[in-house]
């Protein structure tokens, strides 16, 4: 008999806020903790109206809170993470806050 173990991947720990003020702490937003398990995962970041602001990779530096070089306001932003689990495409959605 052959038993296959299938690992389930969950995104439970992501930054709930970031503070892009140039102090070197929490200046960018990303879910880099999943990079070791999901290096090909990517993230779309949206404003409250659903406008796409940025696409980032989990292995990149993250989002700095700007759009076309302009700083965006302190508010909530939404994201969608696309990744693979057991060869199947999956999606995770949630939100975070930008605080200035």
Regions found by a protein language model. Give the residues of each.
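Short loop/turn motifs at secondary-structure boundaries
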Residues: 5-100
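Short, small-residue-biased leader/transition segments that mark boundaries at the very start
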Residues: 1-2
């Amino acid at each position: 008999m052959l038993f296959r173990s299938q690992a389930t991947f969950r995104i439970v720990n992501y930054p709930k806020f970031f503070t892009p003020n140039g102090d070197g702490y929490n200046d960018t937003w990303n879910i880099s903790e999943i990079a070791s398990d999901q290096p090909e995962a990517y993230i779309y970041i949206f404003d409250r109206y659903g406008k796409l602001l940025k696409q980032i990779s989990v292995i990149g530096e993250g989002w700095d809170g700007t759009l076309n070089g302009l700083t965006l306001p302190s508010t909530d932003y939404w994201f969608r993470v696309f990744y693979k689990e057991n060869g199947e495409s999956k999606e995770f959605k949630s939100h975070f806050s930008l605080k200035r």
